[in-house]
Amino acid sequence: MVKIRLARFGSKHNPHYRIVVTDARRKRDGKYIEKIGYYDPRKTTPDWLKVDVERARYWLSVGAQPTDTARRLLRQAGVFRQEAREGA
């Protein structure tokens, strides 16, 4: 199964996360299929969340399952807004 989840990078006590598409059996920080964004939980920069919305929608359309945290971040980035309007 393909998942959209967070992969940690950055230094000790200063986490940053890549939002990646990966096989569910891979390690958290292991090889991934595609990087679709990044997230800075400390919000140290104005662009603390960046997501390639088009690629995220593509991966969701082909069946990728986001984790709870990834789903929350994708929702904040506006990935689900267009889909909700199309279905209504």
Curated annotation (Swiss-Prot):
Q: Name one GO molecular function term.
A: structural constituent of ribosome
Keyword field: Ribonucleoprotein, Ribosomal protein
Checking Pfam families in the record gives: Ribosomal_S16 (PF00886)
Biological process terms from the Gene Ontology for this record are: translation
Q: Which domain of life is it from?
A: Bacteria
A cellular component term from Gene Ontology for this protein is: cytoplasm
Protein family per UniProt: Belongs to the bacterial ribosomal protein bS16 family.
Q: HAMAP family per the record?
A: Ribosomal_bS16
What this protein is reported to do is described as:
Binds to the lower part of the body of the 30S subunit, where it stabilizes two of its domains.
Quaternary assembly? Part of the 30S ribosomal subunit.
Q: Which NCBIfam families match?
A: S16
Name under which the protein is recorded:
Small ribosomal subunit protein bS16
**What species was this sequence derived from?**
Thermus thermophilus (strain ATCC 27634 / DSM 579 / HB8)
